[in-house]
Design a protein with these regions (language model features):
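Short beta-strand-centered segments that line the small-molecule binding cleft or hinge
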Residues: 1-20, 80, 84-88, 104-108
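Short gly/ser/thr-rich secondary-structure transition/capping motifs
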Residues: 2-6, 29-31, 101-103, 143
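Hydrophobic hinge/microswitch elements
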Residues: 52-106
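Flexible hinge/capping segments at coil-to-helix
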Residues: 9-20, 24-46
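Secondary-structure junction motif
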Residues: 44-64, 128-136, 146-152
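Generic preference for hydrophobic
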Residues: 12, 22-23, 46, 92, ...
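Beta->alpha turn/N-cap motifs
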Residues: 1-6, 25-26, 76, 92-97
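A late-sequence structural motif
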Residues: 107-149
Length: 154
């Protein structure tokens, strides 16, 4: 699995779009808002997920010249969600990270659209084994039932 576009060494099959969303503590004043305005970020305590390469998030902030006040950094998705749940700040994450009902956080779409396309890749010129082909088909079928995530069908 990878974010598309990928290296030309791979043949990719897009399976879904993963949008960025704001996550806030349930008791946050904006928890019931219809969208989260990016312009609000510098006025919030921000919990940042330290990923080696989070191009989408950094590109989004750079594009809108927004510089959040990073209160906490973590490398753990679970720690980030727990910190937001505990009221230590807010965050911006990919929607695939959020499992409904697992954490008591409010999830809001951003006032600007930012998403990534996720796909399955196999090496170009490589014929996947039968079991790999069955797995790939299972993944495509499974993503059809993922609710709010937009599934790409070809």
């Amino acid at each position: 699995f990878l974010a598309i576009p990928a290296s030309n060494d791979f043949e990719t099959t897009p399976i879904l779009h993963d949008t960025m969303v704001a996550i806030l503590p349930k008791d946050h004043p904006m928890a019931d808002a219809s969208v989260f305005p990016l312009e609000q970020l510098p006025h919030e305590n921000f919990v940042r997920l330290m990923e080696i390469e989070d191009y989408e998030f950094n590109r989004l902030l750079d594009h809108y010249n927004i510089h959040p006040e990073v209160t906490y950094d973590t490398t753990s998705d679970f720690a980030l969600l727990s910190m937001v749940e505990a009221g230590l700040g807010i965050s911006i994450v990919h929607s695939l990270l959020i499992k409904p009902g697992r954490y008591r956080v409010a999830t809001l779409p951003l006032n600007v659209k930012q998403s990534r396309e996720i796909g399955i890749a196999v090496k170009k010129g490589f014929l996947p084994s039968t079991i790999t082909q069955l797995f790939l088909q299972h993944v495509v079928d499974y993503t059809k039932d993922m609710g709010e995530i937009t599934v790409i069908r070809h």
